[in-house]
């Protein structure tokens, strides 16, 4: 129990650039150049967890990430045709992995949703947003 309490208290401080790189690269967004971990935050409550971080990328890595998103087979330039509530899907527990790639006014976005495979367990929902105006990548992990 003490370990759990300590982990919860120090989780943000123990998060490294390598942890960030692994989470981003899980979605096939490769980071080749040096980058900075600008911000890292997590919050949790009973049954809910939210983790976000922001990376300052090189222009080259930013452009490669945008190209990866825009060249996806399911890329949508008009975000009105995307499922805005992907993480609240009625297929939270069972079903197939879904990835959405789309453009908003401010960012290029890749979302990943994987049902948990077990009734009552939160699915995996992760979002990567690449800024249109800055060399920034924002990662979000939402478990509800």
Where do the PLM segments sit?
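N-terminal export/targeting and maturation segments
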Residues: 2-77
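Extracytoplasmic electrostatic interaction patches
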Residues: 79-144
